[in-house]
Amino acid sequence: MIDFDALVRANAPLNAFTDFDGSAEGGGGALAGLTVGVKANIAVAGMPWTAGCEVYRGRVAPKDAAVVTKLRAAGAAIIGMLNMEEAALGAKTDNPWFGKTQNPHKTGYTPGGSSGGSGSAVAAGLCDIALGTDTMGSVRIPAAYCGVYGFKPAQTSVSQEGLELAEEWLDCIGPLARSLDLLESAARVMTDFGDGDTASGSLVTLAETGVDCELEVIEKFRDVIRLAGSEIALAQLAHPLSRIRFAGFIKTSKAMAAHFADAGGDKLSANLKKLLTYGPKRSDADWAEDQAILAETAQAVQDIVAKHAAIILPTAPQGAFSHSEDAPANQADYTCLANIANLPAISLPMGVDDAGMPLGLQIVGRTGHEADLFQLAREFDAKLQAYRRPDHFLAK
């Protein structure tokens, strides 16, 4: 029996869930006994399907998204809808229509985004598994900021049916959980999970990325390099990560501007309206350059992963920050690569910063070799032992 009264009380200071389904029940199967929260841009039959947008307030999903159908069939109880950044464009989750979501590790701090409710709910023990969506890092950044585990599948490995898309080419649905075992259980149910032959080659990281990282992130990542136990190769991309990420943002802004072209002006926040201007106002020459950069980067990252076992990077250049601060432009500099190259990636806890906020390690692997990716994550997880339960936690 799910104690929804306890869930409502524990959720109140966090605003991770926007709606609960008090009638939710699980069944038999691989996920029997587990509860799942679903980001508000993923359809759950009979539940609000807002995508964090005022323009969709009152919309109710007519049927489950394909991934939700798979989770139900595996026995999971789908218990409610999770807060998110408006239209999934941003990485802070201070939604102007549905409120700010708090990081369970520190009230007043962002859980990341755009799947901020997903990261917060899992970290606080409100659900066992949460579904998020990831356009350029929106599963992995909340996983890092909230100190949990997040999996971004290759876009071609998971259905988009029932997802309110941000950008069709970049978007995918992925799970978050408090352990790699739970994360893999969800991933095996909802994605085309590959048990291909063990990937060979050394680990690799990127040199001269141009990303301005917080000192604690640099120090913790150096610890990861030392713990790897083998030599880490270096690779370099032709463009700074900030330029690559911006090209992805322009692509997303163009798609979303077209999507919301007929939305009432008073139904979109001033911030979202501003973000939706960048793509349409881009000159033809600059847009051609953006597309070339995305294509070149996709091929380069795929080539690096084909040669090496996996790429390791920080998940984000910083830990969670106060809601009173502006979001750094570089939040998705590291995470955008897996979307641009259509590759699977995991974020796992790497340690904490000086403020005690979690930091994340990202591992990007090969499509069809997801089992290898999880095994590598387990090896690092055992060495780092960095998962920490927040004080704000609902124990079952």
Q: Positions of the model-derived regions?
A:
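Short, well-ordered alpha-helical
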Residues: 1-60, 65, 87-90, 320, ...
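A short helix-breaking turn/cap at a secondary-structure junction
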Residues: 16-20, 24, 149-222, 386-396
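Short helix-loop capping/hinge segments that flank enzyme active sites or metal/cofactor-binding pockets
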Residues: 31-51, 250-298, 302, 349-360
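Gly/Ser-rich, acidic/histidine-flanked active-site/gating loops
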Residues: 36, 45-48, 188-250, 278-281, ...
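Glycine-rich, small-residue loops and helix-cap segments
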Residues: 39, 73, 184, 190, ...
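Short, well-ordered beta-strand elements within core beta-sheets of diverse protein domains
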Residues: 55-59, 171-178, 278-282, 363-364
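Short glycine/serine-rich loop segments
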Residues: 69-187, 339, 344-350, 357-360
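Charged, often glycine-rich, active-site loop that binds/positions anionic groups
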Residues: 94, 98-99, 244-259
